[in-house]
A protein has these predicted regions:
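Hydrophobic alpha-helical bundle architecture
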Residues: 90-100, 104-134
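Amphipathic alpha-helical elements of HEAT/ARM-like alpha-solenoid repeat scaffolds that form extended
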Residues: 13-17, 30-34, 47-51, 62-73, ...
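Residue-level signature of the C-terminal ends
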Residues: 21, 25, 34, 38, ...
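Helix-loop junctions that connect tandem helical modules in alpha-solenoid scaffolds
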Residues: 3, 55-56, 91-99, 131-136, ...
Length: 263
């Protein structure tokens, strides 16, 4: 019976092996070939993906080698792609812990996987762009990643992808429509990074919703005025009725008094 060794020592050995394969390779094809030849167990695929990102983040500047390597593994087996999808979420959630240089490299790495369609664009559902759900670090990450994608794809193709109806449910956090404040924040963010064009639909939505909100407020005010007017009218009628009744009673009393005097 084979005993699974998942001790820290074994994990360190695996990482070291992957690290040496990366450092000793002249091309991403050679590196992928070396790692695959080692025949790692499927349970270690996550370590391979994590090491690729870790080595990428350690570079002084982003090296396309790592994006190509990560993309190759994503295309080889869906298990690798799934691990990178999970790592995207983990990296984004902990992005505030990365120093700027590492953050930049990781953002460009994932931008490569996305614009090359090595990674499913559904991972972008992890991003919600509002004032309350972003930090300075996460905004820098999003900025670098989207600018990198725009550079490789072109703004027109990027815009086309972001408007794909089959993917739109995954982009609701990027272009929030839950309230005008969040919509404006997203529009201002993308405009500030030179990608205002991707928010055209959101701008139109904000314009329409603002008009509808204004009309709703006006209708409510008008309804309130009508209620006040109706209440005031009823009050006046009641007052007039009461006054008429009082006058009538007074006349009757006066008439009765006059009749009594004559007798």
């Amino acid at each position: 019976m084979e005993i699974e060794d998942r001790t820290e020592t074994n994990l360190v050995a695996i990482r070291r092996t992957i690290y040496l394969a990366i450092q000793s390779s002249l091309s991403f094809e050679e590196c992928a070939h070396k790692i695959l030849k080692m025949e790692f167990a499927e349970k270690d695929y996550g370590e391979i993906c994590a090491m690729i990102i870790d080595c990428c983040s350690q570079q002084r500047t982003y090296e396309k080698f790592f994006g190509l390597l990560g993309g190759r593994f994503c295309l080889l087996k869906k298990e690798f792609m799934e691990h990178f999808e999970n790592l995207f979420r983990e990296q984004y959630d902990a992005i505030h812990r990365l120093e700027t240089n590492k953050l930049r490299n990781v953002a460009k790495f994932f931008a490569h996987l996305l614009h090359s369609d090595s990674l499913a664009w559904s991972v972008l559902s992890n991003i919600i762009i509002t004032e309350d759900t972003t930090t300075s670090s996460s905004r820098i990450f999003i900025k670098i990643m989207f600018q990198e994608m725009a550079e490789y794809m072109g703004i027109a193709k990027l815009n086309e992808r972001l408007k794909d109806p089959t993917l739109s449910p995954f982009f609701e956090g990027l272009f929030p429509r839950d309230n005008p404040k969040n919509s404006r924040f997203s529009i201002n963010f993308f405009t500030s990074i030179g990608l205002g064009g991707v928010t055209d639909d959101l701008r139109e939505h904000l314009k329409v919703s603002t008009i509808q909100l204004s009309q709703k407020i006006q209708a409510e005010k008008l309804a309130a005025l009508n209620v006040d007017s109706s209440t005031s009218s009823s009050s006046d009628e009641s007052s007039d009725s009461s006054s008429s009744s009082s006058d009538s009673d007074a006349k009757k009393k006066k008439k009765k008094k006059s009749k009594t005097s004559r007798q």
